[in-house]
Amino acid sequence: MPQETEQFCRDVNRMSAYLALDDFGGSGPGPEVLSGLDVIALLGNQVIATLKAACELMRRSLGATLVLSGGAGHSTPLLYDNLRLSSYGGLVRQGLVRETMAEAEMYTAVAQAAFHIPAGSILIESRSRNSAENARFSLQILKDANRRQRTILVLQDPTMQRRSMITWAREAEIAGSDARVLSHAVFVPAVEPGLDGMPRFPAGQVQGTWTMERFLALILGEVRRLRDDENGYGPRGRSFLPHVEIPEPVIESYKRVLASRLNAVAVR
């Protein structure tokens, strides 16, 4: 296997592991955590595993509120296509999930029809277009509905999990929320060398996720946003985020992947 591909995959996986922030060491929330959850918040994304996990955790919780957040954006048609090709595709054929829906509305259709989660346990936030609005509008609808929110579990596309948590913390501070907020990355995305010398997803990460082009664009875009320089979202850039101290090995991996011919070939 070409050494270049092996190095490329190691670098991609290092960035991915950093971005997929998880407070549970990969094992997921246990019964003790679930029994104390007030809110499970799923932020709009295209990865079907995040929707499935949020609904399954909701069913195991004791009276939590499920917040489904997501308007219409870049991920919306990708979410629809992934749902259409998934085990929930029957809901598309029945017209319960439609291409014109906001992400939160698609989520709601699946949560109710496939997981039998009562409508009264769900709050739908269908206006947000970015991670800041996901957090801001979710906190607002919880307040408007007078729902208890002492402990909140947040799920997002694993590539966006770290930035979403940083953004949520900032929006919570602005809103005066002192809730305990937990992060759950449903899985850590990975790539491996293929027989053709190109990076590929392991078999279990092919369906309901991303194209390789989309995945590489996401992780490179996330690290770029987190970097506190003129191109990032930190104080030295667009000031959307506080300063983030990214580990140097992650920065080095980012630079190598950005410069690699494999990145250019993979996204063609």
Regions found by a protein language model. Give the residues of each.
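C-terminal accessory domains and tails appended to enzymatic cores
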Residues: 253-268
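Generic secondary-structure transition motif, activating predominantly at the C-termini of alpha-helices
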Residues: 13-19, 23, 220-231, 258, ...
